[in-house]
């Protein structure tokens, strides 16, 4: 019977296959758009994280694959080979940190072939930054810099200009990304995947996933950009992924093989496409053919895409083509559709009811501060590199630029990487700093060179710097001064206006005085180092350097430095051999703070009592505002069996809040002096703070020390501070967008949909990079921060900041590691302690913007301090002790910031100027500003000025000619008139509120005077 059945099967098989042969099939994949059909744009891509579970280099070479089998080198090798095989295939690439690594390893012959692929459009660079930066935790200057670095590489090597923004993975999207990192780069469109699940559901219903996004109220319609949100994630529809180990069924089109399924797979494709058509406008849809670290064996993808294009087009119901986001954008524009207008931003982001991705606004606060500190340092170092003259053979800022660029990645500064990856980012930053530190020292030595060229040439000054000043460690200032020697302190100001600011350095002796370069004694203040400060200093110097401090600093010396714009001043610290007059008066309160203590002069007071610290500002005789400061911690949720969502590196899910009260025998140390008063307060064994008020200033500075956060009880803790007032704020507050624009927030409200509130705390948290403020009819309270943090106003008249986090559970978002930072010493490891500052000012309504904008610049760009010793007055008498790059008495207007002054490799100089104020923000400063380039570069002759896009990769005029003007539903508002083109004779730059202008400048060769010494400087 079995033989008969088998014979029958052979007969039937012969009938089925009879006349059919297996042969080569030439797939027709020639791209075309068919107006009368649904056009499906297939976009092959690989999303390559510049560090996350593995380090950037491990991801590139494919090492440490026990964590994840990912090798970007294989992706690029494989993709390029596949593109060369078929001219119809296309691929987009985004992360230049990886492509740059791959590019420098290629032969000249391979480079020629790749350039042809780029020129033909087969390989297109999208976004084009070194990484796909985060949008919540970076400062806008860092976002500009990292993108510029990638764009310069693309322009230099390929002569190309990216057209599309591609922020597919960041966890929420900022207004600054839309208008500044989009429209101002000359991008025609911006695409991403992650928006709030409630927002997505509404947009799917209403076909509003694609919009015109107007991110700036100040720049209006001139800064709009077409924006597309993907219907699902940034991967293909289910059943269409084709990496080697993926489970999607391939098209099997050989009739001699089993499982022939062409029509079945064509039907699957058509069904998925028609489903997407139902949620978007026009007859064009885009499929993302790829996801994380795909195309390691690119043939497995391209073979299937070839087949789908061939057979679906042959079927005739749809038109399918290899495409790119640029081609897709052009097709959308050609459709002449009107699009909804989107304003504000896409924060906060939640992917489930109890999963708000707002914890990462604060995660890894020490790393966030390190990035911010080095960002400000890099800005100053580039200026000094320009003033000295770029020397490619010596130390440069290039390594720091690269490390900072990578650190802006959405799993880097965000704090959402694994611990060993965080250490790798920090190491790269440290190595970059060491190179930039040498550059800064040599530049200051050059600029302060001998006053007279006729004098005997001095050897270059060896300047020392102190990167650990934040923990009161500075070998240069702590060293005991031998007889006849003194310490020269050179203070550099990277801002465009004069600064008078208190400088603080640790010293070992109390017998010191401070003089300016003319020999005039300067008012100073000498403070004892607290026990807490000494403990932190000793522990963390040992942790960082592997050894304890050699010297024992006993005091902090503070004096006011007066520094010209884009220049330096010099001061001299000497040991007099007798007790200094500047020793601060200090005393300690006893008992349990049962008596009221008041500190401060003028109209700003600090009051301490059993209730805590109160900051009071007298705005007038009848208007007094008091803000009471306190600490608390949220208990991070561990999740439940029903809903396992826990608080973690990404997600903030609180499960209650507990106040942190001062211990019963808490003491206050009050320090008073001629420059400032401060109060030291130890709340418990792991939280202490210093509250400081400066003479002549209207803000309070709160310096906090938090850690190690106790973990023995198994409770996740998220540490917050609150400022509570009686202001009637009606649920309204304002937070910055990447340190630039301020956006109005209303508690439990979203502009674009009716919010269903499941997490009333986490769902009202927003990212802060500059600060947060609230106001009512009588007053305005502003808080500025020194790094990226999360913040909110959860009750009327109250502001809170999240400062530190230590978790006990992972939040199931892929990192697979608990956020539990520790510091390790030979005697063991313990939780990380962080130090930081925030600043509080109370103003009349509408008056706070001036302080937020100008003081915010001082926070971002602290004074740069360098030290050298001298014998007698030898250095002061033989060097230039003060310097400004500007024409004497000239400074930038207070509403303009100098963002970038950088000499490029080709000798051109990149200059960025930014208006700091928004429209209507301040009656005095929200107006057009003018900058005179001749006075900025008064000792150089400007030969040519060319205005460019924000990244400097194309002329502004050409960019504007190509700009797509989209139709908007309803009113798009008036287009804002920007500053006039720079006249070649007058050389005046005009800036309207929130405008940033980028210029490439060429100078004539000339003899210029630097430090009264002639220098031939070719620029």
From Swiss-Prot:
Annotated Zn(2+) binding sites: 47, 49, 169, 410
Residues with attached carbohydrate: 64, 278, 336, 470, 638, 730, 820
Disulphide bridges: 466-474, 824-829
Enzyme class: hydrolase
Reactions listed under catalytic activity: Hydrolysis of terminal, non-reducing alpha-D-mannose residues in alpha-D-mannosides
InterPro entries according to UniProt: Gal_mutarotase_sf_dom (IPR011013), GH38_C (IPR041147), Glyco_hydro/deAcase_b/a-brl (IPR011330), Glyco_hydro_38_C (IPR011682), Glyco_hydro_38_cen (IPR015341), Glyco_hydro_38_cen_sf (IPR037094), Glyco_hydro_38_N (IPR000602), Glyco_hydro_38_N_sf (IPR027291)
One example of a Gene Ontology biological process annotation: mannose metabolic process
Cofactor note: Binds 1 zinc ion per subunit.
Signal peptide bounds: 1-22
Record key words, sorted: Disulfide bond, Glycoprotein, Glycosidase, Hydrolase, Metal-binding, Signal, Zinc
Documented EC number(s): 3.2.1.24
Domain of life of the organism encoding this protein: Eukaryota
Co-factor requirement: Zn(2+)
Function in brief: Liberates mannose from p-nitrophenyl-alpha-D-mannoside in vitro.
Protein family membership: Belongs to the glycosyl hydrolase 38 family.
UniProt-recorded name of the protein: Alpha-mannosidase At3g26720
The species this protein was found in: Arabidopsis thaliana
